[in-house]
From Swiss-Prot:
GO terms for molecular function: structural constituent of ribosome. Coiled coil: none annotated. It comes from Methylobacillus flagellatus (strain ATCC 51484 / DSM 6875 / VKM B-1610 / KT). SUPFAM superfamilies: L35p-like. This is Large ribosomal subunit protein bL35. InterPro entries: Ribosomal_bL35, Ribosomal_bL35-like, Ribosomal_bL35_CS, Ribosomal_bL35_sf.
């Protein structure tokens, strides 16, 4: 049976934390930024934690993690 492969898209988007949670970056911060307020852009900086309902789905895409 062949090896299970990690989805490249998931590998680039998600990071696993030591406590089992999954970290992701916010979207909407690449272009068309002039119409967004400074507050909107500031709140999109940094990372967010994926909801517990989606963690199982992300783990299925990354079997080696």
């Amino acid at each position: 049976m062949p090896k299970m492969k990690t989805k490249s898209s998931a590998k680039k988007r998600f990071k696993f934390l030591g406590n089992g949670k999954v970290k992701r970056t916010h979207s909407h911060l690449r272009h068309i930024l002039t119409k967004k307020t400074t507050k909107q852009k500031r709140n999109l900086r940094g990372t967010a934690i994926i909801s517990s309902t989606d963690v199982k789905r992300v783990r299925a895409m990354m079997p080696t993690q």
